[in-house]
Design a protein with these regions (language model features):
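Active-site environment of divalent metal-dependent phosphoester hydrolases
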Residues: 3-6, 34-38, 72-74
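Short acidic/histidine-rich active-site segments
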Residues: 31-32, 59-84, 90-101
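A conserved active-site cap/scaffold subdomain adjacent to cofactor or substrate pockets
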Residues: 22-45
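Short, electropositive alpha-helical surface patch
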Residues: 44-57, 80-93, 141-142
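Conserved, mostly hydrophobic/aromatic
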Residues: 28, 55, 69, 125
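Histidine/acidic residue-rich metal-binding segments in metalloenzymes
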Residues: 9-26, 46-62
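Mid-to-C-terminal alpha-helical segments outside catalytic/metal-binding sites
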Residues: 94-142
Length: 142
């Protein structure tokens, strides 16, 4: 998902939804699926990190998690599927998926670098890049 206050899309979460998840001790994952990050132009890594900043300010760093929608190994039909669902792509005005600066797994270090530039601590980055998700799994799978 991503933040609906930043990108108006029915698949993005509202502030109330994020608060409800946090109130139960859960975590929301910020996706790299570009139509959820920005629609008027190809989103950048900074646009992606803006969703983290907003969510962290609203519900705290313990309730936000790294998430991706990778398309490795997809066929032409799989790639075309999002365009059959305009309610999901919300009038995306650019070609391709992914973020400028973070298009593949190989560019994951760019995410960490971007977080460091925003003065995220090592402890926060650890939580965001899997620590929160693992915490929730441990709590749920007792």
């Amino acid at each position: 998902t991503a933040v609906r206050k930043i990108t108006e899309n029915p698949r993005c979460v509202t502030d109330d939804m994020m608060k409800a998840v946090a109130d139960k001790g859960g975590t929301i994952g910020i996706t790299t699926f570009s139509p959820f990050i920005r629609t008027e132009r190809q989103p950048t890594l900074d646009d992606y990190l803006d969703h983290y900043d907003y969510a962290i300010d609203l519900i705290g760093e313990d309730h936000v998690t790294f998430a991706t929608d990778w398309f490795d190994g997809k066929t032409k039909v799989n790639w075309a599927t999002p365009w059959y669902y305009p309610e999901v792509t919300q009038g995306k005005k650019y070609d391709g998926l992914g973020l400028i600066g973070f298009r593949t797994r190989a560019e994951l270090p760019n995410v960490v670098e971007g977080m460091l530039k925003r003065n995220y601590s090592a402890a926060r980055i650890t939580k965001l890049l899997g620590g929160n998700f693992i915490r929730v799994l441990k709590e749920v799978w007792k």
